[in-house]
Swiss-Prot record:
Binding site for Mg(2+) 2: E415
Binding site for Mg(2+) 1: E408, E415
Biological process annotations from GO: lysyl-tRNA aminoacylation
The protein's name in its UniProt record: Lysine--tRNA ligase
Quaternary structure and partners: Homodimer.
Entry's EC annotation: 6.1.1.6
GO cellular component, one term: cytosol
Keyword Secreted (UniProt): no
Keywords: Aminoacyl-tRNA synthetase, ATP-binding, Cytoplasm, Ligase, Magnesium, Metal-binding, Nucleotide-binding, Protein biosynthesis
EC top class, as a word: ligase
Organism for this UniProt entry: Listeria welshimeri serovar 6b (strain ATCC 35897 / DSM 20650 / CCUG 15529 / CIP 8149 / NCTC 11857 / SLCC 5334 / V8)
Length: 498
C-alpha cells in the first residue's frame, strides 16, 4: 500500500473515532443493544416481489429490519441508504420529519459499514424498487474502519483469506460458496443417515499417529506427561466400533497433517469416514456414487457440472478400472507381467519415474500411476487394485495377492475418495505393520507405526467391513467450482505476515 493510501486510511480512522466521541458526548452508545427484527431484506424481496406500489401503500406494512450501510446519500432533510444483511440489500428512505431531528443527526454522522436498525413501512419507489420508509432509526454498531471499495471488493487474494469477514461482506460469490458448503455437509449427513449409518465422534488426540501415511502434529499432555498426536485419520477408532458391534458408523471431522500447503492441501481439513460391517469395497463404490451424485443434484440441481475448464458428468455408472490396466492404457507398461522388484526399478529408470531406496514393485506401480495417469482422469473413475505395499490396512485380493481390494476415486485429475475392504486378519495386519516399521527405518517417515491396541481389538474379531474416506473440502471445491482449497475454508492456515 502506498504512503498516500496509508495517510488516507489514517485520516478516515481519525474521523470515525471523532464521530464516536461526538456520539458519546450526546449520550448515544455507538455500539448498541439487542434489536428485534421482524423480517430480513431477503424476506422482503421474496414476500413482496409481486406487490404493486398501490397495494403496498394501502397495506401500510410495518417492519423492523437491520443491516450494514453499503451506500448513503443525504440531501438536506432527506436521505437514502442501502443496508445489507448477508448478501441481500434493501433501500431505506429517511426523512428528518419522520424520524426526528436527533435521529436524523445521528444518521448524518453514519458511515459506510455502520450497522443500523430501522423501523418503518414497506413501499415501492417511482422506479419500482422495494424500500422501507423509516419511522425510527437506531445506530447499532459504529464501523471504525472503512470497507473495501464496494465495486471491486478485496483485490488481494491473500487478504481475502486473512480477513475473511471483509471478503464475506464484499464478495457475494464467496458468501454463496460457504452457504453451499454448509448445505453439502447437511445433505451428506442426510444421505449417510438414510443408508442406515450412525454418526459418531472419536478422539482428536491419539497416542499413535495411524490410519494414513502422513506426518502428524505432536503435542504434550502435561498431566499425563506423554506425547500425543493430532489425528491424521479417523479410521482406527471407527474400526474398533465395528468390532464392538456398531455395524454402520460414520464421522465427519477435522484431521491434521503436518505437511505442505497448496491449492489442494491445508494442514487441517475435514474428512468423512464410514465403515459398514458385512460389506466390501464394491459396496462402497456404490455408496460413493450414490452419495456424490445425490448431493451434487441437491446443491446444483443437476449431476452435470463445470469445474474450471472441464465439463464433468457425475451421473452414476462411473468407470471402474484396475490400477495395472489403467497404467498399461496410458503408459504402455504392463505391470501384470512384471515379476520382480528389479524389473520394476528398470522400468522406472526407463520411463523417468523417480523412486527411492525403500520402493518395491507396488510402490513403483503407484509412482507410474501418479506420474502419468492420475491427472488425466477427468470424468469420475474408480481406480482399484492398489498394491499391498501402499495399502497396509486393506484386505489382499484373493486372485492376486500383490494387490488389495482397495479403490480411489478420481475426478478432474484429483483423488476424492479412498476406500477398501478392511483387513480383518490380525496376524496379517501385524505383519503389515512390521513391514511399515522397516520402511520407516529405511527413510519413509510417512510409514505406519505399530498400533498394539488396535491389533488387540482385531483379535476379538472384525467382521468383513467396507471402509471409506472422502475429503470433504475437495468435494466442496468440486461442487462449487472453487480453484483453491482456501476458497472453501473460512479461515485457511496462512503463513505469518512479514
Amino acid at each position: 500500500m502506498s504512503n498516500e493510501n496509508h495517510e488516507e486510511l489514517n485520516d478516515q480512522l481519525i474521523v470515525r473515532r471523532e464521530k464516536v466521541d461526538t456520539l458519546r458526548e450526546e449520550g448515544i452508545d455507538p455500539f448498541g443493544e439487542k434489536f428485534i427484527r421482524s423480517i430480513s431484506p431477503e424476506e422482503i424481496e421474496t414476500k413482496f416481489a409481486d406487490k404493486s406500489k398501490e397495494e403496498l401503500e394501502e397495506a401500510a406494512i410495518e417492519v423492523s429490519v437491520a443491516g450494514r450501510i453499503m451506500t448513503k446519500r443525504v440531501k438536506g432533510k432527506v436521505g437514502f441508504t442501502h443496508i445489507q444483511d448477508r448478501f441481500h440489500q434493501l433501500q431505506i428512505y429517511i426523512r428528518k420529519d419522520a424520524i426526528g431531528e436527533d435521529a436524523y443527526a445521528i444518521f448524518k454522522l453514519a458511515d459506510l459499514g455502520d450497522i443500523i436498525g430501522i423501523k418503518g413501512t414497506i413501499f415501492r419507489t417511482n422506479t419500482g424498487e422495494l424500500s422501507v420508509k423509516a419511522t425510527d432509526f437506531t445506530l447499532l454498531s459504529k464501523s471504525l474502519r472503512p470497507l473495501p471499495d464496494k465495486y471491486h471488493g478485496l483485490k488481494d487474494v491473500e487478504q481475502r483469506y486473512r480477513q475473511r469477514y471483509l471478503d464475506l461482506i464484499t464478495n457475494e460469490e464467496s458468501q454463496n460458496r460457504f452457504v453451499m458448503r454448509s448445505k453439502i455437509l447437511k445433505y451428506t449427513r442426510d444421505y449417510m443417515d438414510s443408508q442406515g449409518f450412525l454418526e459418531v465422534e472419536t478422539p482428536v488426540l491419539h497416542t499413535i499417529a495411524g490410519g494414513a501415511a502422513a506426518k502428524p502434529f505432536i503435542t504434550h499432555h502435561n498431566a499425563l506427561d506423554m506425547e500425543l498426536y493430532l489425528r491424521i485419520a479417523l479410521e482406527l477408532h471407527l474400526k474398533r466400533l465395528i468390532v464392538g458391534g456398531m455395524d454402520k458408523v460414520y464421522e465427519i471431522g477435522r484431521v491434521f497433517r503436518n505437511e505442505g500447503t497448496s491449492t489442494r492441501h491445508n494442514p487441517e481439513f475435514t474428512m468423512l469416514e464410514s465403515y459398514a460391517a458385512y460389506e466390501d469395497y464394491e459396496d462402497v463404490m456404490d455408496l460413493v456414487e450414490g452419495l456424490v451424485s445425490t448431493v451434487c443434484k441437491q446443491v446444483n440441481g443437476t449431476t452435470e457440472i463445470t469445474y474450471g475448464e472441464y465439463k464433468v458428468d457425475l451421473t452414476p455408472n462411473w468407470r471402474r478400472v484396475h490400477m495395472a490396466d489403467v497404467v498399461k492404457e496410458y503408459v504402455g507398461v504392463d505391470f501384470w507381467n512384471v515379476t520382480s522388484d528389479e524389473e520394476a526399478r528398470e522400468l522406472a529408470k526407463k520411463h523417468d519415474v523417480a523412486i527411492t531406496e525403500h520402493m518395491t514393485y507396488g510402490h513403483i506401480l503407484n509412482e507410474f500411476f501418479e506420474t502419468y495417469v492420475e491427472e488425466k482422469l477427468i470424468q469420475p473413475t474408480f481406480v482399484y487394485g492398489h498394491p499391498v505395499e501402499i495399502s497396509p490396512l486393506a484386505k489382499k485380493n484373493k486372485e492376486d495377492e500383490r494387490f488389495t481390494d482397495r479403490f480411489e476415486l478420481f475426478i478432474v485429475g484429483r483423488e476424492h475418495a479412498n476406500a477398501f475392504s478392511e483387513l480383518n486378519d490380525p496376524i496379517d495386519q501385524r505383519e503389515r505393520f512390521e513391514a511399515q516399521m522397516k520402511e520407516r527405518e529405511q527413510g519413509n517417515d510417512e510409514a505406519h507405526g505399530m498400533d498394539a491396541d488396535f491389533l488387540e481389538a482385531l483379535e476379538y474379531g472384525l467382521p468383513p467391513t467396507g471402509g471409506l474416506g472422502i475429503g470433504v473440502d475437495r468435494l466442496v471445491m468440486l461442487l462449487t467450482d472453487a480453484p483453491s482449497i482456501r476458497d472453501i475454508l473460512l479461515f485457511p492456515t496462512m503463513k505469518h505476515r512479514d
